[in-house]
């Protein structure tokens, strides 16, 4: 929004031209989201406490989690508000990338909100029925996938980038829709499964978003893209604003979500942030790279799939409890140890993912 005001003011003073630089607006976007989260966080937590919107803890969960019962949840509203305000202020509202991301965050955030509302307000422990949650996620993801495929302006927008192989970038054609769908829905649910300990999901989300900010910037510049053998995607630089807004909002939320948490993000936060990471990966053509950098999310998801599959096929469980972070809790690891070690794994995987841009 302010891009247009700055463009007008440039007529009177060339100093306003600095707002045309994506990097400058990205920094302002990060700071805006961070400051908003830190400032409004206590107010939201107080409001949630007054409304008695507290976390529901399963009786069959780890005993250490019983103390979390009643902790304010739906804090993802704070994250979404910070991102929306930041992007609307500093993003180029004429960019297709910006509106796609706002739609993703809004639609998946709404699905998560309905789920949380049913759990904590209507006291329905099951929340939104799993079937309906998946249907709504699928509708939103398919709408995004079809839109991106129909509006692709150059061949690079529907290529598949394969890490470590600089000349392997096959054209996907209509298969793009299928890949985009599974990436968005899968990422959304993976982050949701990871969000089981204080700060466990938000920090890897921040790390992956920061990495995608760099990738989006490189993809938007022809020279960098050609040098790294990745698709040149004109205009993708605007995704940097979205990514840094996620980073700022995430760090601000972590201030209150770190152990022992004062607030949880709830499904309204985890489903929307996961879908956002998946959509960014689709937009910059780095779906495989998301699997690497988001390895913690993948590990959590696979642990659930393996646990359920093993129990149904063999009648035996592989882990003491799934997702896998609960397994380590039941082994006696203190919660902060599980969290920090998963963060360390995430740092390693993000750096490995970034290294693949050059190791081709």
From Swiss-Prot:
PROSITE patterns: MRAY_1, MRAY_2. Catalyzes the initial step of the lipid cycle reactions in the biosynthesis of the cell wall peptidoglycan: transfers peptidoglycan precursor phospho-MurNAc-pentapeptide from UDP-MurNAc-pentapeptide onto the lipid carrier undecaprenyl phosphate, yielding undecaprenyl-pyrophosphoryl-MurNAc-pentapeptide, known as lipid I. This is Phospho-N-acetylmuramoyl-pentapeptide-transferase. One of its GO terms (biological process) is cell wall organization. One of its GO terms (cellular component) is plasma membrane. The lineage of its organism: Bacteria, Pseudomonadati, Pseudomonadota, Gammaproteobacteria, Alteromonadales. The chain crosses the membrane at residues 26-46, 74-94, 97-117, 134-154, 168-188, 199-219, 236-256, 263-283, 288-308, 338-358. It is a multi-pass membrane protein. GO terms for molecular function: metal ion binding; phospho-N-acetylmuramoyl-pentapeptide-transferase activity; UDP-N-acetylmuramoyl-L-alanyl-D-glutamyl-meso-2,6-diaminopimelyl-D-alanyl-D-alanine:undecaprenyl-phosphate transferase activity. Keywords: Cell cycle, Cell division, Cell inner membrane, Cell membrane, Cell shape, Cell wall biogenesis/degradation, Magnesium, Membrane, Metal-binding, Peptidoglycan synthesis, Transferase, Transmembrane, Transmembrane helix. It is found in: Cell inner membrane. InterPro entries: Glycosyl_transferase_4 (IPR000715), PNAcMuramoyl-5peptid_Trfase (IPR003524), PNAcMuramoyl-5peptid_Trfase_CS (IPR018480). Its cofactor is Mg(2+). Its EC number is 2.7.8.13. Its main location: membrane. Pathway: Cell wall biogenesis; peptidoglycan biosynthesis. Belongs to the glycosyltransferase 4 family. MraY subfamily. It catalyses: UDP-N-acetyl-alpha-D-muramoyl-L-alanyl-gamma-D-glutamyl-meso-2,6-diaminopimeloyl-D-alanyl-D-alanine + di-trans,octa-cis-undecaprenyl phosphate = di-trans,octa-cis-undecaprenyl diphospho-N-acetyl-alpha-D-muramoyl-L-alanyl-D-glutamyl-meso-2,6-diaminopimeloyl-D-alanyl-D-alanine + UMP. It comes from Shewanella baltica (strain OS155 / ATCC BAA-1091). HAMAP family: MraY (MF_00038). It is an enzyme of class 2 (transferase). The gene is mraY.
């Amino acid at each position: 929004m302010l891009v247009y005001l700055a463009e007008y003011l440039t007529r009177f003073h060339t100093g306003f031209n600095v707002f045309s630089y994506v990097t400058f607006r990205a920094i302002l976007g990060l700071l805006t989201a961070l400051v908003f989260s830190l400032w409004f966080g206590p107010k939201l937590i107080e409001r949630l406490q007054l409304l008695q919107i507290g976390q529901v803890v399963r009786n069959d969960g780890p005993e250490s989690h019983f103390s979390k019962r009643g902790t304010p949840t739906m804090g993802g509203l704070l994250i979404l508000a910070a991102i929306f305000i930041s992007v609307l202020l500093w993003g180029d509202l004429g960019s297709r990338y910006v509106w796609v991301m706002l739609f993703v965050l809004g639609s998946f955030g709404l699905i998560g909100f309905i789920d949380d509302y049913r759990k904590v307000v209507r006291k329905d422990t099951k929340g939104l029925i799993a079937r309906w949650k998946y249907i709504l996620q699928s509708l939103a993801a398919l709408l995004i996938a079809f839109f991106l495929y129909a509006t692709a302006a150059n061949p690079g927008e529907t290529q598949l980038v394969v890490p470590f192989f600089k000349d392997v970038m096959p054209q996907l054609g209509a298969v793009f829709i299928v890949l985009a769908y599974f990436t968005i829905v899968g990422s959304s649910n993976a982050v949701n499964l990871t969000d089981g300990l204080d700060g466990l999901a938000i920090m890897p989300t921040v790390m992956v978003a920061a990495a995608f900010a760099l990738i989006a910037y490189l993809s938007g510049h022809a020279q960098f893209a050609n040098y790294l053998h990745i698709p040149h995607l004109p205009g993708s630089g605007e995704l940097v604003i979205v990514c840094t807004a996620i980073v700022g909002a995430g760090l601000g939320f972590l201030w209150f979500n770190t152990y022992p948490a004062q607030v949880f993000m709830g499904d309204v936060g985890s489903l929307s942030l996961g879908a956002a990471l998946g959509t960014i990966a689709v937009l910059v053509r780095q779906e495989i790279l998301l699997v690497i950098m988001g390895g913690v999310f993948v590990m959590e998801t696979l642990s659930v799939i393996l646990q359920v599959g093993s129990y149904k096929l063999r009648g035996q469980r592989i882990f003491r409890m799934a997702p896998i972070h609960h397994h380590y809790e039941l082994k006696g690891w203190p919660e902060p140890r599980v969290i920090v070690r998963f963060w360390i794994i995430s740092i390693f995987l993000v750096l490995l993912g970034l290294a693949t841009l050059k190791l081709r």
